[in-house]
């Protein structure tokens, strides 16, 4: 019989213990499947027939007049377009059904993909451990920054900043006691006394665009299939149950809601999002934030990418670059790497109680909300014995660093194996592995990378490895063999990196390539957003997009270098006029004025003031979409006064005491 993860319905005491006896927590425990139109712009719903007509006309016109310019190696040239413009043809607010149940174990998934269950050589073992040492040594304390509007999740589900600071400060004080309880196997005590442990809270977020093609033979639009797991498949890790394509058919909306859906529009893709228990995350974040500061400073060449010019200066030194694509990064993330990281942290002298907290955070059960109507509200795994292998949970306090550690070394191993075996002699033991990796991350070797977790471009200078680099590129293009033992890696068709397109000229050489904004993203962000503007929420800090109008001010800086930027704006203007009988430019200028005024009022209440003229394009991007502070920019990239608008935290004095208790003396 296959191993089954224990599962507990909400009626079971195991699940009930995860939710405090307050209104928000009890509502979260029973949160039902919800769908409905979002407010794309103030007063304009995503299902408005005029808006759908506009998206229909615009997506067809742009695809017809500006076809993708991508060569057989996935490199973008010419007009800077990497794919068609049909991605906006979604009924925003209405998801595919069902979403996936998260796998309780990814061991079979990795085995089926022929991925290794540990380092395949002593060299690789040394490199993974060297990465831990370089990232987690010589850390300097920083304030513990907490995102405004975020939830503490299990068990209290509070959004109040004062409450979050209280939880964080208490967690730093009690972390050692909780960690020692976990070392004794007393996970229930650690949770009941200090709320450290419990489970991840799984919700489903919309991915408001997805791949859509037009079949030239039938004239029908086709949306990319998204495979989802049913409950049985999830609890057995794929040993039983079903994996099948979710339905994106939007025709159901007519019968259910009376919405007329134009031909070729689809329901949105949905992905799992896991909120971590904040009391457990806070002690992890207090270490993770100094790690980020260190690698974004010392290893900025590899890990910190600000302006396009900054990225171009790195790439222009290369003779070859390859944009990579990684399949299912979070669900493939290996548990053996967690064990290796924890082992090496102990070798370094990290406090065992903190390492146990960290390890537990990567093995927690998951409470699944509502993947479909009449489904969910179930706890997978036992909080008394956390042992799931779900991969990398998006709500873990150092999730970005875990992705960075895995993928940076995975990319390096791939480069060494296929292009630079002559460098292996420099990796003999831990000191030499650390020296080599330090040099590599600083961009001093003939093989290089710029990366942020699974988003990366690999590079080769004019050294001996270049010939092998071209062979690897051919291997990736053919797609017959996975070049990595650790993750499924291919080349990216339409090379993009952190939202920008690497645009080649006729020479197809990195030295003459430039980064330009992804024009598809510009359109999707405006007309197929993940979240509505929530105009009914008076407190801007509680909105998903507090100042969406500001995106208009930064649009030219962000996307203006794309060769067809002006043509696209003209097409938008014409199609908008056809649908609404008014100017889109005037509409957005008015929206910008209103949000600029609201911003000045909001920031005036903070410690410092700022006018629009003082804000950088990055500030404007982050204010329009604060999520970019999590995946694209860092605290150092954003003006201090704007950071105060979005974040608050625990003083450096308190985090310093905590960090000193955790790190080697």
From Swiss-Prot:
Q: Provide the protein name.
A: RNA-directed RNA polymerase
User: Where this protein primarily resides, as one coarse class?
Assistant: virion
Quote a single Gene Ontology cellular component term: virion component
The answer on whether this UniProt entry bears the keyword Manganese reads: yes
- Record-annotated RdRp catalytic domain positions: 310-485
EC code: 2.7.7.48
**Subunit notes for this chain?**
Part of the packaging complex composed of RDRP, P4 and P7. Interacts with P7.
Q: Which domain of life is it from?
A: Viruses
- Annotated source species: Pseudomonas phage phi6 (Bacteriophage phi-6)
PROSITE patterns xrefs:
RDRP_PHAGE (PS50522)
């Amino acid at each position: 019989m296959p191993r089954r993860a224990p599962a507990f319905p909400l009626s079971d005491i195991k699940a009930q213990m995860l939710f405090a006896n307050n209104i928000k927590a009890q509502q979260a425990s029973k949160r039902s499947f919800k769908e409905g139109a979002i407010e794309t712009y103030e007063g304009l719903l995503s299902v408005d027939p005029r808006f759908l007509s506009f998206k229909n006309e615009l997506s067809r016109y742009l695809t017809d007049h500006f076809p993708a310019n991508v060569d057989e190696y996935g490199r973008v040239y010419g007009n800077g377009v990497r794919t068609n413009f049909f991605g906006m043809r979604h009924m925003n607010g209405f998801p595919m059904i069902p979403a996936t149940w998260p796998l309780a174990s990814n061991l079979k998934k990795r085995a089926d993909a022929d991925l290794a269950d540990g380092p395949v050589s002593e060299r690789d073992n040394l490199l993974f451990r060297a990465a831990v040492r370089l990232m987690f040594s010589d850390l300097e304390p920083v304030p513990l920054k907490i995102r405004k509007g975020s939830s503490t999740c299990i068990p209290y589900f509070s959004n109040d900043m004062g409450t979050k600071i209280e939880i964080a400060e208490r967690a730093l004080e009690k972390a050692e006691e909780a960690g020692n309880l976990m070392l004794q196997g007393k996970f229930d005590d650690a949770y009941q006394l200090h709320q450290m442990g419990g489970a991840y809270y799984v919700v489903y977020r919309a991915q408001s665009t997805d791949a859509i093609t037009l079949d030239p033979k039938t004239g029908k639009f086709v949306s990319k299939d998204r495979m989802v797991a049913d409950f049985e498949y999830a609890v057995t890790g794929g040993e039983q149950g079903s994996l099948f394509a979710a339905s994106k058919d939007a025709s159901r909306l007519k019968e259910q809601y009376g919405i007329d859906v134009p031909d070729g529009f689809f329901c949105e893709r949905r992905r799992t999002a896991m909120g971590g228990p904040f009391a457990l995350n806070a002690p992890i974040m207090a270490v993770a934030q100094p790690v980020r500061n260190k690698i974004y400073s010392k290893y900025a060449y590899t890990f910190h990418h600000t302006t396009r010019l900054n990225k171009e200066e790195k790439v222009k030194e290369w003779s070859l670059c390859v944009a990579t694509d990684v399949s299912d990064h979070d669900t493939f993330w290996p548990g053996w790497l967690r064990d290796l990281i924890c082992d090496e942290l102990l070798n370094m002298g990290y406090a065992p109680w903190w390492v146990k907290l960290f390890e537990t955070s990567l093995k927690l059960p998951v409470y699944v909300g509502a993947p479909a109507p009449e489904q969910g509200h179930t706890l997978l795994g036992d909080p008394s014995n956390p042992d799931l292998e779900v991969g990398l949970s998006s709500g873990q306090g150092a999730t970005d660093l875990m992705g960075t550690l895995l993928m940076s070394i995975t990319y390096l191993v791939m480069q060494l194996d296929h292009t630079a075996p002559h460098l292996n002699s420099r990796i003999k033991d831990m000191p030499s592995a650390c020296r080599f990796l330090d040099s590599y991350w600083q961009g001093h070797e003939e093989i290089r990378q710029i990366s942020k977790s699974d988003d990366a471009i690999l590079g080769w200078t004019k050294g001996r490895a270049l010939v092998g680099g071209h062979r690897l590129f051919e291997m990736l293009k053919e797609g017959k063999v996975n070049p990595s033992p650790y993750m499924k890696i291919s080349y990216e068709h339409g090379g993009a990196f952190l939202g920008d397109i690497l645009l080649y000229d006729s020479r197809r050489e990195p030295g003459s390539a430039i980064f330009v904004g992804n024009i598809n993203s510009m359109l999707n962000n405006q007309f197929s957003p993940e979240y509505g503007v929530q105009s009914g929420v008076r407190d801007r800090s509680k909105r998903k997009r507090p100042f969406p109008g500001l995106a208009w001010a930064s649009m030219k800086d962000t996307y203006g270098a794309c060769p067809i930027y002006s043509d696209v704006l003209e097409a938008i203007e014409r199609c908008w006029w056809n649908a609404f009988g008014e100017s889109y430019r005037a509409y957005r200028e008015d929206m910008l004025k209103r949000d600029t005024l609201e911003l000045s009022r909001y920031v005036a209440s903070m410690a410092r003031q700022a006018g629009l003229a003082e804000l950088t394009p990055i500030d404007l991007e982050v204010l329009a979409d604060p999520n970019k502070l999590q995946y694209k920019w860092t605290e150092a990239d954003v003006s201090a006064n704007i950071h105060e608008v979005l974040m608050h935290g625990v003083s450096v004095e308190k985090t310093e005491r905590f960090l000193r208790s955790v790190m080697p003396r």
